[in-house]
Structures are given as structure tokens and as C-alpha cells.
């Protein structure tokens, strides 16, 4: 590097950290510092590193790029002659296809980043990588860096982008404590990609935070390590990081989409869910997919015939069970042209449509004249009461259908104006949506379970479950098993 556009600015920022260089600033705190000093987030990250590691600006950027030297070489190996035991020659296949036109996506930078991400994974299976949270997130990091190096960005900007990747990666490296692509290739990769692309496209530090939240959200609770022992599956995980990061960046930069969640909250939640969910989800992954794991022929020669026979039987059993599970779903599905449900206002057929239909069933049983209401919702639904309580109340008090926008908007005010007692309570049991209605003559109750598409499962009711199911069918509400 010969010309340094940002050197003076970043050197002046070192003073922000010099009194307490090892202070553990969170990512959101660094974003706030960057905004306060009119600096890029990568500038603040570089200044902090200079204060902590006692490097000059030039040496820091050299060290940052040097940290990816091996991984970039691995990328080249995967792109040219590498062959993975799980991904085959996917990278060189794409390199060939790219000669005739962009193989994966029309955006040249993103297409290159995705191709090089896969190339890095292929090379990883040949010679290994320097890991961050794991070798998984090193793939999108390396793929993105190589794509940026080939794009007409100055070397200094690429080095600063790489520093930002390392900073974000360092947090995920600590947060990843068990199996999980959500804290590695998919999640960490998406967050870092979003941050880098947002900054390079002229985004503010605040926009970087929003882009990261948007990119990270779909990745949470995706522990995939056992799953990727199945050939091919990892390909969409690690390239998905690039796609999600790009999408998060564009949404943050080009729209007024509200994103109220702090990025520290999002990463902390991702790490916590990662620890809690991975053991449960991984055991299910393994049950279904272990028969499809890649094997080593030489190792298999060491396994006894009875064990191999048992595993073949397990594979056949998994196929049978899976087909029966899908067959059960098919039996419950509607005719092709009746697949879609009734219009649901409020934003979610599960969070609003299903509870609203519960209210409609209760209204049908009560016959109108409601003088008291009690609603119990599982924690997930209770936390979304802003959107589902209006639906439940309009269904229960008016018998309104799920598409009645006017009733949805006026019912809570009507309840408050008329002074109808309404009790709302959370319950710990999953899926629960339960309602009691009281009239001058009787009390009715519908105890149901939340289902998507506006459906509901009725488990109990007053005067009877049978009458509730009959009422639902009369109203055209789909009762799920």
C-alpha cells in the first residue's frame, strides 16, 4: 500500500482508547463511538487495535491482511484443483460456469464472493484453514475478502474491511461453544458480510448495526455441524451467509425498514440460543441424517459386518418413517386449489389468525352478549399480544372473520369504552391459546393449540369439545390434529 486515505483520521482516533486500551467495548458501543466521532466502524476498530497492540497504522493493516494469507491460498486451491469429500469439485465447476456468465447471482461482487466461499471450503477439506469461530466462518470471510480484492476498491479499504471482519469474528469465536452454523459459517458469516458491505457502500455506523441484525436474524438456532456430514448440504449454508449479509446491507441502506433491536442483544441471544438449542436440534438432525453421512471406505473396512448391516437397516427405517410422516401431512392437506387459507389481517396467520379463529369459535358457542373475557396465551403468543389480542377480541365479541380490518382496529377501544372486563394471562405450556367468555346466561371455554395458516387444534371446550369442533367447521375454520 502506498497511499493511505484514512491514516490521519484513524491515528487521531487512537486517543479515544489510549487511556484504557483493554476496555472491553461491545460492538454496539463501538458503533456509538464511531457515530460520535464521525468515523467509519472499521476506523474505530483499527484505532482500538492500534492502541491495544501498539502497532502503527501501516503494520496493523499488513498484519490484518497477513492473517488471511493461508486461507486465501486455500481458496485458490479449491478454485482450481481441489476436491472435497463433501462438496466434490463444486468450486472449480463454478469457476468454469462463470466463464460463460455469472453462475450463482447477477451481482458480480456477490457471485465472486459466493464462488470463493465454496472454493475456500473445498480447499479446507484438502489442507485445512486458520479458523475463527471455526473453519466454517473462515470460508465466507475469505471468499468475501478475495472478491473485494478483485473489485476496484483501494487496498486500504479492503484491509479495513478485513479488520472489521476480524473484530466481528472475534466475538463469534468466543460465543460459539457447541455445534452450530448459527455462530459460525452462516450466522457469523452473515453478520460480518452485512457490516462490511454496508460500510463499503457508504452506510453509517448505525446502518451497519441494523444490517447485522437483519442478516443475523434468520440464522439463529441453526446448529448444522452433524448435518453437514451429509454431502452437499454445507454449500447453501456458507454461501447463504453472503446472500443474507448482502440482503441485510441493502435493506439497511435503501429502505426505512424499522429495526429496533440492538446488535449486542441479537448476538447475545444468538449465542444463548446456540448453547440451549444445539443439543436438542442436533439429536434430531442425527436421527434423520446419520444414514446419509459421508463414509470413508478404508475406515468402513474396520467396521464389523453386523454393525454395517444394522446401519443399513437404520437407513431403511428412516426412509420409511419419513415417508409416513410426510404421508400424514399430505392426508391432512387441502385440495390443491383450496390450499391457501382465509385472509388474515394483523401480520401473521399463526400469531393472529389462529387465535382469532379461537375467539370466533367461542363467540359461536356463547351466542353473543359477552360481559367478561379471559384469555390465556403461551409466552410466545403473549409477547405478541399487540397484534393478536385485537384479533381474539373481535372474533370473540363480534364474531368477526380474520380479514375484518375495521373491527380489528376498533375493538380494543370499544372494549375500553364499554368497560368490558378482559383478563390477559401468560401460560408456560407451549402452543396454548385458551379463552373463556361469560354472558348473562352461561360460560363457554375453548382450549386450543396454535397452528399456522389460521388453523387451530381444539383440545377441550365448554359446553363440549364436540360442539366446539362442530362450530369451527360451520364457520369454515380448519381444525388441525
Regions found by a protein language model. Give the residues of each.
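A structural-propensity feature for long, helix-poor, extended segments
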Residues: 163-205, 210-211, 217-248
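A short glycine/serine-rich beta->alpha loop
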Residues: 100-103, 123-135, 175-184, 229-235, ...
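Acidic-glycine-rich active-site phosphate/pyrophosphate-binding loop
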Residues: 106-123, 155-174, 218-224, 362-372
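Structural helix-adjacent loops and short alpha-helical linkers that scaffold large soluble proteins
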Residues: 152-160, 202-209, 254-263
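Active-site cofactor/substrate anionic-group-binding motifs, chiefly glycine-
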Residues: 74-139, 152
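Catalytic-core signal marking the mid-to-C-terminal active-site face
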Residues: 1-71, 257-481
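Alpha-helical support elements that line or immediately flank enzyme active sites
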Residues: 97-103, 138-155, 195-202, 394-401
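Glycine- and small hydrophobic-enriched segments that form the cores of compact globular domains
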Residues: 126-139, 144-162, 168-171, 176
Amino acid at each position: 500500500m502506498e497511499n493511505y486515505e484514512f491514516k490521519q483520521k484513524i491515528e487521531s482516533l487512537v486517543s479515544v482508547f489510549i487511556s484504557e486500551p483493554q476496555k472491553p467495548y461491545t460492538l454496539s458501543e463501538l458503533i456509538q463511538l464511531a457515530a460520535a466521532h464521525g468515523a467509519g466502524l472499521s476506523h474505530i476498530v483499527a484505532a482500538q487495535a492500534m492502541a491495544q497492540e501498539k502497532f502503527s497504522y501501516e503494520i496493523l493493516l499488513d498484519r490484518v491482511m497477513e492473517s488471511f494469507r493461508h486461507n486465501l491460498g486455500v481458496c485458490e486451491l479449491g478454485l482450481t484443483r481441489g476436491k472435497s469429500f463433501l462438496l466434490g469439485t463444486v468450486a472449480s465447476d463454478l469457476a468454469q460456469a462463470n466463464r460463460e456468465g455469472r453462475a450463482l447471482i447477477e451481482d458480480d461482487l456477490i457471485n465472486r464472493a459466493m464462488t470463493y466461499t465454496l472454493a475456500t471450503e473445498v480447499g479446507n477439506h484438502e489442507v485445512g484453514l486458520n479458523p475463527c469461530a471455526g473453519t466454517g466462518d473462515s470460508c465466507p470471510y475469505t471468499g468475501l475478502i478475495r472478491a473485494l480484492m478483485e473489485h476496484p476498491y483501494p487496498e486500504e479499504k479492503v484491509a479495513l474491511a478485513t479488520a472489521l471482519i476480524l473484530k466481528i469474528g472475534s466475538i463469534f469465536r468466543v460465543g460459539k461453544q457447541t455445534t452450530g452454523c448459527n455462530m459460525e459459517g452462516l450466522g457469523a458469516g452473515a453478520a460480518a458480510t452485512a457490516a462490511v458491505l454496508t460500510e463499503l457502500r457508504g452506510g453509517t455506523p448505525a446502518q451497519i448495526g441494523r444490517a447485522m441484525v437483519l442478516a443475523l436474524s434468520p440464522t439463529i438456532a441453526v446448529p448444522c455441524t452433524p448435518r453437514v456430514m451429509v454431502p452437499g448440504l454445507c454449500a447453501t449454508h456458507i454461501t447463504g451467509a453472503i446472500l443474507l449479509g448482502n440482503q441485510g446491507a441493502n435493506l439497511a441502506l435503501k429502505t426505512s425498514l424499522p429495526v429496533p433491536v440492538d446488535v449486542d442483544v441479537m448476538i447475545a441471544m444468538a449465542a444463548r440460543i446456540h448453547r440451549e438449542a444445539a443439543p436438542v436440534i442436533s439429536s434430531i438432525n442425527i436421527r434423520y441424517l446419520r444414514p446419509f453421512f459421508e463414509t470413508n471406505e478404508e475406515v468402513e473396512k474396520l467396521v464389523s459386518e453386523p454393525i454395517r448391516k444394522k446401519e443399513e437397516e437404520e437407513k431403511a427405517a428412516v426412509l420409511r418413517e419419513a415417508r409416513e410422516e410426510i404421508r400424514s401431512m399430505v392426508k391432512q392437506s387441502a385440495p390443491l386449489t383450496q390450499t391457501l387459507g382465509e385472509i388474515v389481517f394483523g401480520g401473521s396467520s399463526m400469531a393472529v389468525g389462529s387465535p382469532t379463529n379461537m375467539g370466533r369459535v367461542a363467540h359461536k358457542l356463547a351466542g353473543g352478549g359477552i360481559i367478561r373475557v379471559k384469555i390465556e396465551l403461551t409466552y410466545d403468543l403473549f409477547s405478541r399480544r399487540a397484534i393478536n389480542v385485537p384479533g381474539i377480541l373481535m372474533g370473540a365479541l363480534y364474531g368477526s372473520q380474520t380479514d375484518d380490518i375495521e373491527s380489528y382496529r376498533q375493538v380494543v377501544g370499544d372494549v375500553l369504552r364499554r368497560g368490558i372486563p378482559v383478563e390477559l394471562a401468560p401460560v408456560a405450556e407451549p402452543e396454548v391459546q385458551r379463552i373463556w367468555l361469560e354472558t348473562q346466561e352461561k360460560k363457554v371455554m375453548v382450549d386450543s393449540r396454535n397452528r399456522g395458516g389460521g388453523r387451530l387444534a381444539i383440545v377441550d371446550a365448554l359446553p363440549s369439545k364436540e360442539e366446539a369442533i362442530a362450530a369451527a367447521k360451520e364457520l369454515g375454520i380448519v381444525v388441525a390434529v
